[in-house]
């Protein structure tokens, strides 16, 4: 590897919209802002919602007059 051609890594902070701050190393020189992180994303927090598909399927069948085969 050649010397002195690679960008310098700096410690910056990524701040989420929920207020959580994550220290990371990057070639970027300024701090970053994130929309979601592991502290506020529904998948990681366990607050995710599941969609009730049965009602939607029944509505579709009713709309197009499908009967059970």
From Swiss-Prot:
Tell me which Gene Ontology terms the entry assigns under biological process: translation
Report the co-factor binding details. Binds 1 zinc ion per subunit.
What keywords is this UniProt entry annotated with? Metal-binding, Ribonucleoprotein, Ribosomal protein, RNA-binding, rRNA-binding, Zinc
Cofactor(s) demanded: Zn(2+)
Tree of life domain: Bacteria
Enumerate the residues binding Zn(2+): 16, 18, 37, 40
Fetch the PROSITE patterns from UniProt.
RIBOSOMAL_L31
Q: How does it assemble?
A: Part of the 50S ribosomal subunit.
Per its record, how is this protein called by name?
Answer: Large ribosomal subunit protein bL31
